[in-house]
Amino acid sequence: GLLGVLGSVAKHVLPHVVPVIAEHL
């Protein structure tokens, strides 16, 4: 379903996004 797709995308994206956000905090 859609939530499954969003979950899969989040698992791939979050590991890359979190460090970038952390650098700006």
Swiss-Prot record:
GO CC aspect terms: extracellular region
The protein's superkingdom reads Eukaryota
Which InterPro entries does UniProt cross-reference here?
A: Caerin_1
Tissues/organs with expression: Expressed by the skin parotoid and/or rostral glands.
Pfam families assigned = Caerin_1 (PF07440)
Q: What biological-process terms (Gene Ontology) are attached? A: defense response to bacterium
Major location, coarse class? secreted
Locate the Leucine amide modifications and list their residues: 25
Tell me where in or outside the cell this protein is found: Secreted
Annotated keywords:
Amidation, Amphibian defense peptide, Antibiotic, Antimicrobial, Secreted
Domain description: Contains two amphipathic alpha helix regions separated by a region of less-defined helicity and greater flexibility.
What does the sequence similarity comment in the record state about its family? Belongs to the frog skin active peptide (FSAP) family. Caerin subfamily.
Known role: Antibacterial peptide, that adopts an alpha helical conformation which can disrupt bacterial membranes. Each caerin displays a different antimicrobial specificity.
Output this protein's name.
Caerin-1.2
Q: Which organism is it from?
A: Ranoidea caerulea (Green tree frog)
